[in-house]
């Protein structure tokens, strides 16, 4: 779980224990199926974004919150602040992390989604996914990314059920990042009228 202030189920990472608990059989080759989006892994978009954030910050998994802070109605004081807490840490060797990040950068600079990201003011690391559901329906389209590449501050995750290829979501992710970085720093300039939380 991510710690977000909503009802949330734990994600499922496919593996021998889970497969056998569901009455299935885990084979040595099953790990290859998991690596390409098959088998029984199940994660929410917020869990995927949390995973990407953990990966690119070097292995510290922090709680997710909807709000940064709550201010009094006259904006004179901060009533409550939400600080993320460390939920867990994972060990990632620098060379492995850099290899993963380099692969994610290559997707946006030389890969199937480069046309969407070439005009952004920052470099982006991303990964597409097409999680198979059944032979009768389109795969679930999955797209995760982080930016800026050298000093990450935002992670996105998108899932469209039966959306086909994850690369189809690249344009949407690029639009979100374009807006995010074009408005960066302007939040302090928003007038107080009609603004409840900042």
Give residue spans per PLM region.
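Periplasmic/cell-envelope proteins involved in peptidoglycan metabolism and beta-lactam response
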Residues: 119, 126, 159, 167-198
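Beta-lactam-recognizing serine transpeptidase/beta-lactamase-like catalytic domain environment
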Residues: 1-158, 196-198
């Amino acid at each position: 779980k991510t710690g977000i202030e909503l009802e949330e189920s734990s994600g499922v990472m496919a593996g021998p224990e889970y497969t056998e608990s569901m009455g299935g059989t885990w084979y040595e080759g099953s790990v290859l199926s998991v690596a390409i989006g098959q088998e029984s892994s199940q994660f929410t978009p917020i869990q995927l974004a949390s995973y990407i954030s953990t990966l690119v910050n070097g292995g510290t998994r922090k709680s997710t919150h909807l709000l940064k802070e709550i201010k009094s109605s006259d904006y004179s004081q901060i009533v409550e602040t939400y600080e993320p807490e460390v939920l867990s840490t994972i060990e990632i060797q620098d060379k492995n992390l850099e290899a993963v990040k380099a692969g994610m950068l290559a997707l946006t600079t030389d890969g199937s989604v480069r046309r969407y990201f070439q005009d952004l003011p920052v470099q982006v690391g991303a990964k597409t996914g097409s999680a198979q559901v059944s032979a009768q329906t389109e795969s679930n389209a999955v797209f995760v990314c982080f930016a800026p590449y050298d000093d990450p501050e935002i992670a996105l995750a998108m899932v469209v059920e039966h959306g086909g290829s994850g690369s189809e979501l690249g344009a949407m992710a690029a639009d979100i990042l374009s807006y995010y970085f074009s408005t960066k720093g302007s939040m302090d300039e928003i007038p107080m009228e009609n603004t409840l939380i900042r």
